[in-house]
Amino acid sequence: MQLCRFNDDRLGLIRGDEVIDVTAALKVLPPCSYPLPKHDLLIAHLDTVRAEIEQLIQGAPLRHALTDVLLLSPVANPGKVVAAPVNYAKHLAEARDDQAIHHQNQIGEIQRVGLFLKASSSVVGASEGLRIARPDRRNDHEIELVAVIGKAGRNIPAAQALEHVAGYCVGLDMTVRGPEERSMRKSPDGYTVLGPWLTTADEVADVGTLDLLIEVNGEVRQRANTRDLIIGVAGLIEFASSFYTLQPGDILMTGTPEGVSQVFPGDRMVAQISGLGRMTVDIDD
Ligand code: MN
């Protein structure tokens, strides 16, 4: 199933080039009150919502053309955004070779430097666009495969890790280059783009063989395959959960391949991963 959040927080089911409005399925979510849970309510109850959607589509819910809707982040309230710093060998070489990328920061192997966190306030959907936070700096796109955690866990072994994934989407880990810590440079508003929608894990046969592609203004900048990840999705979940409990709705950004490059106000990025969809993201003027 491919589910989007669109327009005014509507829930949509993707069918070809249409979005079926299945917002009514959200009525199965339990009421929640202050203090809010540490997980995303929809992702935590995804199985129940999916069953309700199957019922709903027997009727004749409203349909929209995909081109007519505004796509929001498929996860509304991620508790945390966990990210892999340098997780493709060719990007490690590129980052070490280019002073404009490394800024005298030591670029270590992921096994040694570990993961980092991005502010959840940086998350947006494809249609929300983003504004360059520091126009005085180099700002880069990083296309990444994103796994959305579906089931809570701590110390999850790699062999069971994929059972904790609700689904996958395309991610852009936007980055201000410079000497500061990654968590600061990668957390401005809009610097985590998720979309175009959530593809549930049962629809992804092998997450280790997906093609990634991003074009900026029609020019290919990054083209890679997840088979070249240094630590794959299961290993990243094992690694992350050895430090903290993963919750439903937590976002795992798996790292970017080689080809990162600068973007400017007015640029249009088109990012796609095989089976997960293609999203167009504009950088505000
Ligand atoms: Mn990244």
Give the positions of each predicted feature.
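N-terminal non-catalytic cap/leader segment that marks the start of a structured domain
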Residues: 1-105, 109, 205, 213, ...
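A generic local secondary-structure boundary/capping motif
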Residues: 1, 71-73, 103-106, 130-139, ...
